[in-house]
């Protein structure tokens, strides 16, 4: 059979330098938007109104991407980034703006997406939920790369759009209790006999203090364990190891971890591999706002989808007659059930279900009458379970989202089913980045 090959285009503009490019506005991801050859040109780190010299790094049929080579005319909003790694690190992308400007960009982006994907858009957003702009992250994962030539282990976040690690020295968005561990942790990891067989290291913070989780592909030796024990005692951290399985093992320090939601007198146990909201202060405010927007009453029966450890479920249980939490992973269901027992909440029950499946109505819990629903899905959204939710005809549907694009898309479905978008608001869960958390209330 004859084979035909299409020659690569000879007019590719990749790596070309463009001068006097004017940025028109920012998109919902905080990227500068300009136009070149009648198609969008997205520029990381650019601000509206700026005049730039830009290098094309990617050219597609419908759009191009560029990076700033020189700022010819800077925006009045541009500030100097606080982190010395900002120009090379892929972790943050809005440090060149103050917090108020970041909030405005995210708010504008959220409204813009709803204007594109939803029929009815609120005239304005609810007051945004904000807190500290720095020193807020209670979780972080650092990559580890072993250099065979110099026998050294590099620890750091990845460069933007790259698998290469930076040589991390500081990270000012981390809680101070975690950031201060970066230098001594690098020394420890480079002292281990198994340093050529490490995957990544995670830092997190619990009520029991700082936690280190080390992913290792080779069994830790006795000398390695001794070094880890000494490090744990000196730095006052809880140290966990994770081999090939997903199970983590406490190597030194406190094995039982938890965090509190004091407003509702709830304590939630977790393991280092469980999902946690990265911003503890915003998380507490988020739970509080969710409870207010749902207008919970004592006789309510609430369904909490994508419930995780019970971050929303347990506080809700303090206010209502009954609440059912649904999660896709059985281990998380077991953890949430244990958390309900720990908090002496008899009116909270948890079940495992594939929330992307089509047979939700056949589940044993699905025949209950729920008058209010809360859902907090991953970035992919909750498109597959919206028909089931609407079928239950709840008076309130509260949707918490970490991706405004899928929230706007899913909102269209609920609006088409007769629900009204009653409230829409931004939660600044991730300052210094373009990522946003948002909350929408639908009533019917």
From Swiss-Prot:
Enzyme's top EC category: transferase
Protein's gene: rlmD
Role according to the record: Catalyzes the formation of 5-methyl-uridine at position 1939 (m5U1939) in 23S rRNA.
Source organism superkingdom: Bacteria
Short name of any one Pfam family annotated for the protein: TRAM
Residues reported to bind S-adenosyl-L-methionine: 277, 306, 311, 327, 354, 376
Name this protein carries in UniProt: 23S rRNA (uracil(1939)-C(5))-methyltransferase RlmD
Catalysed reactions, semicolon-separated: uridine(1939) in 23S rRNA + S-adenosyl-L-methionine = 5-methyluridine(1939) in 23S rRNA + S-adenosyl-L-homocysteine + H(+)
Phylogenetic placement of the source organism: Bacteria, Pseudomonadati, Pseudomonadota, Gammaproteobacteria, Alteromonadales
SUPFAM superfamilies membership: Nucleic acid-binding proteins, S-adenosyl-L-methionine-dependent methyltransferases
MF GO annotations: 4 iron, 4 sulfur cluster binding; iron ion binding; RNA binding; rRNA (uridine-C5-)-methyltransferase activity
Binding site for [4Fe-4S] cluster: 83, 89, 92, 171
Family per record: Belongs to the class I-like SAM-binding methyltransferase superfamily. RNA M5U methyltransferase family. RlmD subfamily.
Example of a GO biological process term: rRNA base methylation
Entry EC number(s): 2.1.1.190
TRAM domain: residues covered: 11-70
Naturally occurring in which organism (per UniProt): Psychromonas ingrahamii (strain DSM 17664 / CCUG 51855 / 37)
Active-site residues from the entry: 402 (nucleophile)
Keywords recorded for this protein, A-Z: 4Fe-4S, Iron, Iron-sulfur, Metal-binding, Methyltransferase, rRNA processing, S-adenosyl-L-methionine, Transferase
InterPro entries according to UniProt: 23S_rRNA_MeTrfase_RlmD (IPR001566), MeTrfase_TrmA_AS (IPR030390), MeTrfase_TrmA_CS (IPR030391), NA-bd_OB-fold (IPR012340), SAM-dependent_MTases_sf (IPR029063), TRAM_dom (IPR002792), U5_MeTrfase_fam (IPR010280)
PANTHER family: 23S RRNA (URACIL(1939)-C(5))-METHYLTRANSFERASE RLMD, RNA M5U METHYLTRANSFERASE
């Amino acid at each position: 059979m004859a084979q035909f090959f299409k020659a690569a285009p000879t007019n590719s503009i990749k790596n070309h330098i463009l001068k006097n490019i004017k940025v028109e506005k920012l998109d919902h991801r905080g990227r500068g938007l300009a136009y070149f050859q009648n198609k969008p040109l997205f520029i990381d780190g650019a601000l509206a109104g700026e005049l730039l010299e830009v290098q094309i790094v990617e050219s597609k049929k419908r759009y191009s991407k560029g990076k700033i080579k020189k700022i010819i005319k800077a925006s009045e909003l541009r500030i100097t980034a606080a982190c010395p790694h900002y120009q090379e690190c892929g972790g943050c992308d809005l440090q060149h703006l103050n917090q108020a400007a970041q909030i405005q960009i995210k708010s504008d982006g959220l409204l813009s997406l709803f204007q594109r994907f939803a029929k009815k858009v609120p005239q304005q957003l609810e007051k945004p939920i904000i807190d500290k702009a720095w020193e807020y992250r209670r979780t972080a994962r650092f990559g580890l790369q072993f250099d065979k030539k110099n026998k050294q282990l590099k620890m750091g976040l990845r460069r933007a759009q790259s698998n290469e690690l930076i040589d991390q020295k500081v990270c000012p968005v981390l809680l101070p209790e975690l950031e201060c561990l970066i230098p001594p942790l690098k020394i420890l990891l480079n002292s281990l006999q198994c340093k050529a067989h490490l995957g990544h290291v995670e830092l997190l913070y619990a009520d029991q203090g700082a936690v280190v989780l080390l992913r290792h592909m080779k069994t830790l030796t006795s000398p390695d364990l001794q070094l880890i024990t000494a490090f744990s005692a000196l730095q006052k951290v809880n140290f966990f190891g994770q081999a090939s399985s997903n199970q983590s093992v406490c190597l030194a320090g406190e094995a039982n971890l938890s965090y509190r939601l004091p407003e509702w007198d709830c304590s939630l146990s977790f393991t280092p591999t469980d999902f946690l909201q990265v911003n503890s202060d915003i998380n507490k405010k988020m739970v509080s706002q969710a409870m207010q927007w749902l207008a919970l009453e004592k006789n309510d029966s609430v369904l909490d989808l994508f419930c995780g450890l019970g971050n929303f479920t347990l506080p809700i249980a303090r206010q209502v007659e009954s609440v059912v939490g649904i999660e896709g992973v059985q281990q998380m269901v077991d953890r949430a059930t244990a958390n309900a027992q720990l908090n002496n909440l008899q009116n909270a029950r948890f079940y495992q279900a594939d929330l992307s499946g089509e047979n939700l109505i056949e589940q044993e819990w699905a025949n209950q009458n729920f008058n209010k629903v809360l859902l907090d899905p991953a970035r992919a959204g909750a498109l597959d379970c919206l028909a089931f939710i609407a079928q239950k005809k709840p008076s309130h549907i509260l949707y918490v989202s970490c991706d405004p694009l899928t929230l706007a898309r899913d909102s269209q479905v609920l609006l088409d089913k007769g629900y009204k978008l009653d409230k829409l608001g931004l939660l600044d869960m991730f300052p210094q980045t373009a990522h946003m958390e948002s909350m929408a209330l639908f009533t019917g």
